[in-house]
């Protein structure tokens, strides 16, 4: 019996060594996604709540949706970016000459190598994707932010948008890690997500495979019940990329001290181990 116990201890220690070695040879990329809820419900107060949390988290990249600018409101992503010292890439189907523009954005404090955008098909759904490649710890990281069609019956529209999103990522990415954040307006098990989940790992689901739907939910049930997990962070599935989700947390799940919610959505912060 003593011999078996000793052999078991040796096996456990042997298995533990590679994990510690892997952790020592990886850097951690911190990624946030959040639907800003445009200018609804006291934006100046919500802005303060969002800024405080982002300063605490110090993410390497932030993916934003429902970003608004109009003659009365400065571009919300630019307001955040200036306060945080970040580069801002804003993507909108509304041209730069338009007084009102609405879309997605990416913020990063790191040196930007590429920033661009693409409108998603179908054109009459007015959806876009933002793309930034930035330098990070001796590597190049490609980040994408998007927001898909919103109706429950619109699965076919979302499927088309996902096909175009995946093709766009394939045609624009570099050789480093890829992260995709956004409001997909659907959960992982829906038919329209099949392509996405065949190519990418959902960070929250990977880290918390046994979380209940309520625990993982990203839409505030006070605003609409039973929406579930519609905001996602994705990284690649391919083992050769050596990218591993190691942590994920739902953020903005509680109101601030003055009862102000950051958004009608909760946000996600994921930590991704990237092998050196």
Locate the predicted segments by residue.
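N-terminal secretory signal peptides that target proteins for export/translocation
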Residues: 1-4
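Structured beta-strand-rich core segments of catalytic domains in phosphoester-bond hydrolases
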Residues: 43, 61, 65-148, 245-250
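Active-site neighborhood of phospho(di)ester-bond hydrolases with catalytic His/Asp-centered motifs
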Residues: 62-65, 89-92, 179-183, 202-206
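Metal-dependent phosphoester-hydrolase catalytic domains
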Residues: 133-135, 170-179, 186-276
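A long, amphipathic alpha-helix that forms part
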Residues: 158-176
